[in-house]
Amino acid sequence: RVHTVRDVIVEIDQDGRVVDDFRLMEILDPYRDNVIKTLDQGAVCLNIDASKAGQTISAAELAEMDKSDNFGDVVGVGAGRNWAHVNSVDYDPTDDSIIISSRHQSAAIKIGRDKKVKWILGAPDGWKKGWAEKVLQPVDKDGKPIKCENGKCEGNFDWTWTQHTAYRIDEMSDADTLILSVFDNGDGRGLEQPALAEEKYTRGVIYKIDQKKMTVQQLWEVGKDLGHEYFLSLIHI
């Protein structure tokens, strides 16, 4: 028996019949914990525990959770834990694929009808062989590669962190180029909690993805300059 928490996406037709399902614990790596260990533990579950605000979780604590039978909306790794926390699903009709936003992996991920990952828009840290090759390469406006390491990138490019609403902008996209808008909440940005909570910020961001070259360019962002006053750890718009 396998316990699951929001790690199966089910496609249902207008008559309520199941057409297909995407079992994320088989498609992705439910043991990638790089992001989960850096999240604010006061803002990871449906039942928010304010007493844990500002705290992170250790590898030992994650391992202990895996030994427990207390399944439910509990952050952690492994099938049955809240390791994916998918909060949006969009559809790309050009190749019959879905685009998911996985909050607890801090990644937008495109998955084909064949259940294979097409690309991953997120920090490369922690992705094992088979997934690492699918992580998009950031580039600047001239197409030159941008160096990224330990969750941080050179220049103005940034990944999204604990994001929501990764949506394809249909009127600007085609089969080769996908324009993606994302609400970047920003918790665990750069795979760490800042020294001061007031350093956190939320932003809206638009990316241009070249699906043939497997590159991503950041086209636009708003919110970074507004700072912590507009930071939203859980909510999206």
Language-model-derived ranges and their functions:
Residues I235-I237:
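Conserved small/polar residues in nucleotide/adenosyl-binding loops
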